[in-house]
């Protein structure tokens, strides 16, 4: 009688003591896991090591695309936990620096003026800060596929989860090819080569990144986010030098706050509301870090650090950078709206006005990297959103198919097919087409943020109602549930401001077409919610029947020990400095 002990390299046949032997005949066994049904022969009384069948790199690559047979993990549904803490931190930072701040800030500055930009971005920044903390607590407690759309389904309402999921997916279907067309506009800064060629290059590049699965996405995002962070810090330093008159080629001398004080509040209350909504859309993408929960090696360790850095990211990369640029470019500058693409970026205009020749081209390259990074992040988040549709029963089961490397194949294929919409850049009216397509899900980010806050509020209420302790959770928001109430109210105010500006646009008359372009997604998501509610007759989720057990990640003994050390005040100076560093950067 033999006992088989497996490891990754071989199968060992270990005999029992001689007195238990019955015969010396060879025994045969089939190990289907490691040998694909090949017979492993071992003789009683002997120990034989059978080397595992080695695969070359090419065969291993091909086999990686085979469908994962065992996808019973309810949390990940076949997704692989291969993202490290450094990936999560840089994904969070990368989501904060995109075209919204580089280029989109031009419209904000023109509509509302420097003071409105500063005030509105501070207000919306606090809203995002509170939302990310709520998301971090939910992601650590339930590190499941779908992240906040799954949380909305479980803690708010199944029909709302259905409507939110599809609205979120629609946004990626449109914005990814839109990012590709934006990238072609960046390249036109250097050459007028056919835009369709560059769309093809971008599609091939994104395909190449995603061949390597979630780890490839994480590494590429880490590299591109690092470049964006360095570039933003470099501009802040350069902006201070320009404002102080330290650039030899700039003959304007010291400027101080003179430009900032001119037209500080443009278009009065209407301008303030317009910037309020623009600021909210500029922060879109900060929720992507929550999507990665099901593919993070240690969510309980990675997410608290990434969440605590949110305040630092908002303060430096948005508030400080926009304050610096508003010292250099007036909100009344006609170039902010008469120019297009990167030429309208206040960051580029500030460098051009200082007569620094090479830097505008370098900054354009940085913005191009931001566009590619944004498309890469949206492809990742969008494919996981489509995958979660199938997992939650909101779409065909084929949407859940994942290969051995953890790639959601069908979800990625769907998004790659819609990328071909990027070739609309060859038509004359492509921007009009995208505007109407984007209107279907234009408010999706706000609905997501509001759902995160509401899900957190109801989750906390259910924990209290079911007599569950927050000590079971690996990470808890230090602001309790009050921060989620604050953020939820602000989301409602942003939606109201967008409604007001859509009816009474800045610098124009009321227009039905403009209104539906900006606000069509609100009635669309309500129609999805009502139709699903009526057809499936879903029941209301009460605090008593809310599921707090499935996929719940209990705090580990190691985390409990660390918590006890903190409460006992036994942290060393080195540990305290590390904690302060984690909170700030």
Swiss-Prot record:
Pfam families: AA_permease. It is a multi-pass membrane protein. Keywords: Amino-acid transport, Endoplasmic reticulum, Membrane, Transmembrane, Transmembrane helix, Transport. Residues 1-89, 143-159, 215-221, 293-313, 383-407, 458-486, 533-585 are cytoplasmic. GO terms for cellular component: endoplasmic reticulum; membrane. Residues 10-19 have a biased composition (Low complexity). Residues 1-34 are annotated as: Disordered. Residues 25-34 have a biased composition (Basic and acidic residues). The chain crosses the membrane at residues 90-110, 122-142, 160-180, 194-214, 222-242, 272-292, 314-334, 362-382, 408-428, 437-457, 487-507, 512-532. It is found in: Endoplasmic reticulum; Membrane. One of its GO terms (biological process) is amino acid transmembrane transport. GO terms for molecular function: amino acid transmembrane transporter activity. It comes from the Eukaryota. Belongs to the amino acid-polyamine-organocation (APC) superfamily. This is Uncharacterized amino-acid permease PB2B2.01.
């Amino acid at each position: 009688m033999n006992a088989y002990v497996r490891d990754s390299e071989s199968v060992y046949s270990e005999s029992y003591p001689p007195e238990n032997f019955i015969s010396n005949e060879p025994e045969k066994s089939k190990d289907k896991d490691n040998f694909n049904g090949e017979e492993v022969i071992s003789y009683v009384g002997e120990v034989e090591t059978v080397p595992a069948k080695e695969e070359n790199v090419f065969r291993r690559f091909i086999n990686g695309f085979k469908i994962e047979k065992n996808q019973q993990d309810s949390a990940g549904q076949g997704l692989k936990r291969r993202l490290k803490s450094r990936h999560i931190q840089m994904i969070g930072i990368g989501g904060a620096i995109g075209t919204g701040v580089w280029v989109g800030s031009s419209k904000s500055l023109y509509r509302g003026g420097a003071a409105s930009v500063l005030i509105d971005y501070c207000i919306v920044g606090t809203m995002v800060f509170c939302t990310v903390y709520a998301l971090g607590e939910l992601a650590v407690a339930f590190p499941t596929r779908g992240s906040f759309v799954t949380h909305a389904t479980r803690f708010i309402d199944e029909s709302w989860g259905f409507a939110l999921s599809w609205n979120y997916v629609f946004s990626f279907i449109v914005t990814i090819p839109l990012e590709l067309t934006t990238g072609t506009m960046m390249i036109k800064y250097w050459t007028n080569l056919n835009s369709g060629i560059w769309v093809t290059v971008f599609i091939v590049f994104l395909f190449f990144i995603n061949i390597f699965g979630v780890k490839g996405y994480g590494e590429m995002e880490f590299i591109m986010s690092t470049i964006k962070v360095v570039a933003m810090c470099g501009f802040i330093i350069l902006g201070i030098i320009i404002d102080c008159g330290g650039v030899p080629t700039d003959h304007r001398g010291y400027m101080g706050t003179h430009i900032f004080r001119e037209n500080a509040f443009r278009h009065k209350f209407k301008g303030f509301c317009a910037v309020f909504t623009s600021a909210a859309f500029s922060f879109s993408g900060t929720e992507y870090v929550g999507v990665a929960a099901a593919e993070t090696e240690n969510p309980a360790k990675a997410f608290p650090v990434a969440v605590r850095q949110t305040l630092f990211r908002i303060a430096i990369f948005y508030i400080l950078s926009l304050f610096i640029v508003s010292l250099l470019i007036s909100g009344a500058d006609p170039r902010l709206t008469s120019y297009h693409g990167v030429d309208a970026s206040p960051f580029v205009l500030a460098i051009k006005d200082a007569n620094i020749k090479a830097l505008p081209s370098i900054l354009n390259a940085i913005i191009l990297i931001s566009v590619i990074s944004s498309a890469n992040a949206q492809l990742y988040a969008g494919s996981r959103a489509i995958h979660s549709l199938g997992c939650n029963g909101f779409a065909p089961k084929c949407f859940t198919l994942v290969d051995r490397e953890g790639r959601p194949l069908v979800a990625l294929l769907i998004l790659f097919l819609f990328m071909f919409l990027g070739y609309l850049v060859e038509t004359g009216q492509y921007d009009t087409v995208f505007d109407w397509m984007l209107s279907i899900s234009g408010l999706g980010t706000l609905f997501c943020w509001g759902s995160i806050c509401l899900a957190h509020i109801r989750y906390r209420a259910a924990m209290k109602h079911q007599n569950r302790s927050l000590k079971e959770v690996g990470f808890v928001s230090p602001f309790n549930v009050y921060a989620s109430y604050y953020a939820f109210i602000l989301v409602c105010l942003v939606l109201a401001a967008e409604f007001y500006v859509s009816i009474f646009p800045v610098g124009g008359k009321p227009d039905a077409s403009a209104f539906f372009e900006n606000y069509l997604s609100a009635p669309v998501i309500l129609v999805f919610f009502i139709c699903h509610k009526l057809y499936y007759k879903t029941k209301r989720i009460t605090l008593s029947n809310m599921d707090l057990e499935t996929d719940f990640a209990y705090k580990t003994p190691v985390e409990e020990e660390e918590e006890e050390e903190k409460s006992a005040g036994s942290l060393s100076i080195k540990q305290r400095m590390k904690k302060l560093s984690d909170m700030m950067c």
